[in-house]
């Protein structure tokens, strides 16, 4: 049943992508890909018509459903029949399809990334971080095999496309080597060699009860330095997400000031660096969602 669903969804996706020709931003990594996806959506969504994955729609079923803009049918044959009818209507009727799709692409086992990039033409690829102890290693005998699988995304970018890489993660930084000619590469990180350099990171706290806290930092790109002040942001992992989004935003013609204006408040995801009020005047940082060691340290 699953293979049949995959096949049908893949066909519908290819038809819709060929019909509407949206630009596609794809994100992967073992750490921070969902936060990066949300940050990219927040930036691009301010200036373009954009759609991104909802919930955990980042696999061979979820990515096509995001392309279709339809909820899945679960275990119901009748609901899946309705999904396919909706897809046919989208193909026939036309309409106000998004200009840009922001797609998180998860990798659980060998072949996953090759499958997704086999029918999704990627204009901009973002690789967040792998880390020393990455998640999702159950089906990969060695860490290098997982890295190789994720690097397929960078190598699959269309001619004259964009690849955005985490400079501070050596495994990700090295993915810039051997990319096809004509691909533009932007790196981001705290390291001095990053294209987009993060600096002056500080956490401010005025009143937790009133939600008056957040982070300030600066992003520098090609001599331009712009300060960022983002409410309700805690942790450097979210700063990395913003920097990744800045790289994508500039690939779509935005400047750092326009990107900064999209981040007055931080997106909040369940289980990802959220503050929860505890007992005895304590506060708990909830960063528990499928967390890897790198994401929580």
For every predicted segment, state its role.
Residues 10, 14-20, 45-148, 235, ...:
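ATP-dependent carboxylate-amine ligase catalytic core
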Residues 27, 35-53:
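A conserved segment at the C-terminal end of the G1
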Residues 1-10:
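N-terminal pre-Walker A segment at the start of P-loop NTPase domains
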Residues 271, 289-296:
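Glycine-rich phosphate/pyrophosphate-binding beta-alpha loops
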